[in-house]
Amino acid sequence: MDLPLSDEQIRELDESTLDYLLWRNKGIDITQLANSLQVDAPTLQEDTNRLPLLARKWTAIARLQRRIMSLEQNIRDLREASIEMNAPAFSPESSESARIAWIAPAQPRASITLESPVTGVRLHPELAVVFVSTEQGRLHCFDLMDITLPLASIQAHTRAITSVDVFCWQQTTYVVTGSKDMQVRVFTWSAGQGLKLLRSFAGHEHVVSGVRIWVGPRTTNIGGGSLLLASCSRDTSVKIWDVNSGWCLKSFQPHSDWVRCLDVYGEFLITGCQDSTLRLTHWPSGNGLSVGLGHDFPVESVRFIGSLQDAVTTEGRTNNWLGHCVSTSRDRTSKIWLLPQPRRLPQRPPVPHSTDAQFLCKWTLRGHDSWIKAVGSRGDHVFTASDDKSVICWNWTNGQCLKKWNRIHQGFVTCIDLDDSNHPLKRKIMVTGGIDCKCHIFMQ
């Protein structure tokens, strides 16, 4: 068979082959082989550490092949991102459905490099701004359209920030942080003034592990219509604070171990604990309403999803379920729970249902290989971030895995946040943070 090579290339290949054989076995006599190939017999090289030409080309081909495979993967990712960015909208209805069902592209639009591992990220509810907290206790504010320099930066705590939350109320942006220094602090932010400390709350006796800020329902007899703050701690307590007055309105112990995370919806508060349980509490009264059992290791994050329902439907029939929540754990699973409806009595706070006081596990989501540290939600989707360096998007209504971002960070993924699918500006943003000191921004 004729080789697809010129005479000169054939001669160089024969010489390189003989040179390689002599380099491999210096005692071999290749004179006869050289004569049969009609090339000059090579001489023994003095530098025995130098690879012959054939070996160098062979390793170069392997490196080029790996590079080609990497470039082909990048092309596929970029093509996928381009299709998502330029997908046409055929009608207002289909465009709105696609926006609500949006899933972030494979590659981030931009990345922010911080001075230490990222511990928390929160999007501004109204502006294209993200707040990032770090292991060194610093709180940064970045414009998503220009991340070259932060809009504001402050040393918020003396130790690592463990949790951050943002809320807009009466034309003011409030940023709340919890820290390992046992402090809870509230800052105000504006484009002109930056971050300004409004108030510090001292009352916990151990690490503050989670914070949430919201406006209390006017129907409650405690903090109704006021700006409230909830914090949980390793001291096993949950505290409700009035941001304006600085008073602690309520303190209760939903668990007997470290309360690692919490979320608030109206007058209901849900917590996850070191003992692997979850608990739903009516925070104005402190009444424990129901408990979630099913995780094998500590619960790392918890979040209400969807909307909570009234006890009686519009048709007058009793509704057995209050709503849904999602929890993530060190057992490498996430669970979608149905929350049982508490018993409501006239002129009295809710109490546990007499026959049904346990969460019902609707779905168990498996796909991560390590601890699942954080969870975010957007419409019918929940996003779980794990120590296996990946993020997975799930449809929480049916438990289906929709997309997985492998090696989204070079280390553990510690936090995630997404914009609200009902945002009036119809934006599509996802941000993640990791111990690689990076904050990745996915947007369209």
From Swiss-Prot:
Presence of keyword Coiled coil: yes
Record localization: Cytoplasm, Cytoskeleton; Cytoplasm, Cytoskeleton, Spindle pole
Superkingdom, taxonomy of origin: Eukaryota
Alphabetized Gene3D superfamilies for the sequence: 1.20.960.30, YVTN repeat-like/Quinoprotein amine dehydrogenase
InterPro entries the UniProt entry points to: ASTRA_WD_repeat, Dynein_regulator_LIS1, LIS1_N, WD40/YVTN_repeat-like_dom_sf, WD40_repeat_dom_sf, WD40_rpt
Keywords of this entry: Cell cycle, Cell division, Coiled coil, Cytoplasm, Cytoskeleton, Microtubule, Mitosis, Repeat, Transport, WD repeat
One of the protein's GO biological processes: establishment of mitotic spindle orientation
CC terms in the record's Gene Ontology section: cytoplasm; microtubule; microtubule associated complex; spindle pole
Entry's Gene Ontology molecular function annotations: dynein complex binding
Main location: cytoplasm
WD repeats: 113-152, 156-199, 204-251, 254-293, 307-347, 367-406, 408-444
Coiled-coil zones: 59-87
Family statement: Belongs to the WD repeat LIS1/nudF family.
Cited function: Positively regulates the activity of the minus-end directed microtubule motor protein dynein. Plays a central role in positioning the mitotic spindle at the bud neck during cell division. Targets cytoplasmic dynein to microtubule plus ends, thereby promoting dynein-mediated microtubule sliding along the bud cortex and consequently the movement of the mitotic spindle to the bud neck.
PANTHER family given in the database record: SUPERNUMERARY LIMBS, ISOFORM B-RELATED
Subunit structure: Self-associates. Interacts with NDL1 and dynein.
Designated name of the protein: Nuclear distribution protein PAC1
Phylogenetic lineage: Eukaryota, Fungi, Dikarya, Ascomycota, Saccharomycotina
